[in-house]
């Protein structure tokens, strides 16, 4: 019972965040300096935004950089304010200087909003204490935050990676169960595939997250992570065999009508899903796995495959489920390989600065957007006669996310949560609760808010708002005067952030669809080349298979976000959704062919070359349609035509997959040709060629 409590992801996270915030307050209360303890607890907010609690092989180096930036921004803000430099100019300069961090790496990019939050906190402190005191608070606060988190991760060793792996196993279980519960609905892929696409997307997202964590921890070089690395490779093998399909609905229907295959296949899928959920709990709660066997289920599937040798569905399901059962029984990967190399971009400072100076730099555009929003917020504060509009500025930074959809949701949660929290705080302030009870309530609210923040940001905002009001009450005894202005400030900040995302150099995902589609086709082409090569090696095959899945996942994410964006043609996005559906079929065929190539199921050199040429021509036709902007730009008549495919008796499984890939590619070319007439006619779409949009 205690394992389920202490290792639960939400509980473990909430305990860590609550303790790192509340222990300084408790120490301040004991020594009679409660106000210093409350001020000290502001620093973890900056550290959380900067991601300084991310387990990393350079953990303390990142802490030093973060503390230096926080203290530096605080010092610059105080000195420039003392020289009567306008606040909009100060924030614009800080934003444009620190914006280069986004060119170094995505993790470094989080230092920009965190450093700006530190500068904004300084606004509320300037004039009330010496210049050096905020610097000392940031330096010591970051040191305390780092030491505490280092001790916590040492105490709960491997827990962040275990949480991600546990989520991955659970997602694979849900995906496997959902996939085979729709067995008889495969006749209508448009209805059966979308929910599976969402689950497949979540699984690939979690795989990418595990890759990032392992590379940040250098897990492949650390013996302490050997068991978790093996569990991750097992999950990769399971995902490979779960996310495959023959896409022969007629054959599926025949087999279901002639036998009890549907019940047997579903029995196998449910057994696999149940075992994956048990393994997810074992990983999360630090338990050794128990023995497992599914001989009866596999035996029943083998019997059906032998009774219907003319039907490929039985053999296909038996082959893949037997591999899944082997992984679950032996608790070892199907084959040995190293961890795929880290592809995340990391640049040294000088090359990053060079890229940042280009007007095409996304990092520069993002910094420009934030600087304009900060300036507008500062000017709005001046118009409202607020000398220090720190709450408007903080709201803008807290609700601004990477995309339009995420920002819109965060704005809704933030505004409603703040409203409810201020109402609750306003009512309870009239009760004149003693200080000791107030601190106890703040502790409970902080813990409860962190328990739910990952799943419901709005309700967590309610708790944080009440805590903020009580903090002001304890520091200045004017919490009631804080309520109405802060509500107005929150609404103003949300409006500024929304306007900035819509009108200031927006990066619409709809405009990135064809680039991501082009990248997905390139990944497919490289995978097919490897599969049809003379001597395909297991490790390069595994790496390229994952790149194919990740490229398609990026495309699918872009489509999902584009469907939520304003002002785009719904018919065009609907056609692109169908295009992405066929792209997912190709991914599943590549997953299946990778397993066959690794088992040395190969074609003759001449036949492999002919199939490779056909696939490459079909892919290039799709790329031509994506690349040229004007109708007819790639020629109204297809320049590249697929050669006649060999017709010789019964096709092998590998040939069946290749034939279907070519069919899907031809369909995708037709879809993109029809969808092109309804494409957007503004923004990034004004580029005449796709390569012009790649910067």
Name the predicted role of every residue range.
Residues 23-31, 47-48, 72-80, 97-102, ...:
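Alpha-helical membrane-inserting segments
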Residues 27-42, 76-93, 134-140, 380, ...:
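Structural signature of hydrophobic alpha-helical transmembrane segments
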Residues 430-571, 577-580:
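Generic detector of multi-pass transmembrane helix bundles and their immediately adjacent loops
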Residues 31-32, 346-444, 466:
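Core alpha-helical transmembrane segments of integral membrane proteins
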Residues 11, 15-19, 60-68, 88-93, ...:
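Hydrophobic alpha-helical transmembrane segments
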Residues 2-14, 19-132, 146, 150:
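Helix-loop-helix transmembrane hairpins and adjacent membrane-interface loops
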Residues 1-15, 22, 26, 30, ...:
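Long, hydrophobic alpha-helical segments that serve as membrane-spanning/inserting helices
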């Amino acid at each position: 019972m205690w394992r389920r409590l202490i290792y639960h992801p939400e509980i473990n996270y909430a305990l860590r965040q609550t303790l790192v915030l509340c222990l300084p307050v408790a120490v301040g209360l004991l020594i009679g300096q409660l106000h210093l303890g409350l001020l000290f607890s502001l620093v973890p907010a900056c550290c959380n935004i900067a991601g300084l609690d991310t387990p990393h092989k350079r953990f303390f180096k990142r802490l030093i950089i973060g503390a230096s930036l926080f203290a530096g921004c605080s010092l610059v803000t105080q000195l420039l304010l003392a020289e009567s430099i306008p606040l909009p100019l100060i924030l614009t300069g800080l934003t444009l200087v620190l914006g280069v961090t986004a060119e170094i790496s995505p993790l470094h990019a989080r230092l920009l909003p965190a450093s700006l939050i530190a500068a904004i906190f300084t606004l509320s402190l300037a004039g009330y204490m010496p210049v050096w005191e905020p610097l000392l608070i940031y330096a010591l606060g970051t040191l305390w935050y780092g030491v505490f988190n280092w001790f916590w991760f040492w105490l709960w060793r491997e827990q962040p990676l275990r949480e991600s792996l546990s989520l991955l196993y659970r997602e694979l279980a849900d995906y496997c169960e959902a996939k085979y519960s729709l067995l008889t609905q495969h006749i209508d892929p448009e209805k059966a595939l979308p929910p599976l696409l969402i689950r497949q997307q979540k699984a690939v997202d979690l795989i990418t997250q595990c890759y990032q964590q392992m590379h940040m921890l250098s897990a492949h070089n650390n013996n302490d992570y050997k068991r978790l690395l093996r569990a991750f490779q097992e999950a990769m093998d399971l995902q490979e065999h779960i996310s495959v399909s023959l896409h022969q609905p007629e054959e599926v229907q025949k087999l279901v009508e002639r036998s009890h295959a549907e019940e047997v296949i579903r029995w196998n899928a449910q057994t696999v899903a149940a075992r994956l959920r048990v393994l997810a709990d074992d990983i999360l709660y630090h338990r050794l796995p128990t023995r497992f066997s599914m001989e009866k289920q596999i035996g029943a599937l083998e019997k059906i495959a032998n009774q219907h040798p003319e039907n490929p569905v039985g053999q296909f399901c038996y082959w893949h489920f037997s591999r899944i059962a082997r992984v679950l029984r032996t608790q070892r990967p199907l084959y040995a390989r190293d961890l795929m190399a880290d592809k995340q971009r990391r640049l040294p400072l000088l090359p990053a600065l060079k890229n940042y100076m280009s007007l095409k730099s996304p990092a520069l555009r993002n910094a420009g957007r934030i600087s304009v929003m900060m300036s507008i917020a500062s000017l709005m504060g001046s118009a409202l006669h607020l000398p220090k509009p720190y709450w408007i500025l903080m709201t803008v930074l807290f609700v601004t996310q990477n995309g339009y959809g995420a920002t819109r949701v965060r704005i809704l949660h933030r505004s409603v949560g703040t409203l409810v929290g201020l109402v609750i705080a306003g009512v309870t302030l009239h009760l004149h609760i003693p200080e000791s009870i107030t601190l106890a309530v703040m502790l409970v609210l902080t813990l409860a808010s962190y328990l739910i923040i990952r799943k419901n940001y709005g309700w967590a905002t309610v708790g944080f708002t009440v805590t903020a009001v009580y903090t002001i009450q304890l520091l200045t005894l004017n919490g009631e005067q804080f309520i109405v202005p802060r509500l107005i400030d929150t609404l103003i900040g949300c409006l500024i952030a929304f306007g900035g995302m819509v009108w200031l150099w927006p990066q619409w995902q709809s405009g990135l669809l064809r680039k991501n589609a082009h990248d997905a086709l390139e990944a497919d082409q490289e995978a097919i080349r490897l599969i049809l090569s003379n001597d395909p090696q297991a490790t390069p095959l595994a790496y390229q298979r994952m790149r194919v899945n990740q490229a398609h996942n990026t495309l699918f994410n872009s489509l999902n976000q584009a469907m939520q964006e304003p002002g785009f043609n719904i018919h065009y996005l609907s056609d692109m959704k169908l295009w992405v559906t066929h792209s997912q079929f190709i991914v599943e065929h590549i997953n299946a062919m990778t397993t066959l190539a690794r088992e040395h199921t190969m074609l003759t050199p001449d036949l492999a070359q002919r199939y490779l040429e056909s696939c490459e021509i079909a892919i290039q036709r799709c790329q031509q349609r994506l690349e040229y902007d004007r109708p007819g730009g790639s020629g109204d008549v297809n320049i590249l035509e697929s050669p006649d495919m060999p017709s010789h008796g019964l096709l092998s499984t590998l040939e069946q997959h290749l034939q279907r890939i070519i069919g899907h590619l031809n369909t995708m070319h037709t879809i993109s040709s029809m969808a092109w007439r309804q494409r957007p006619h503004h923004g990034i779409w004004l580029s005449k060629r796709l390569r012009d949009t790649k910067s």
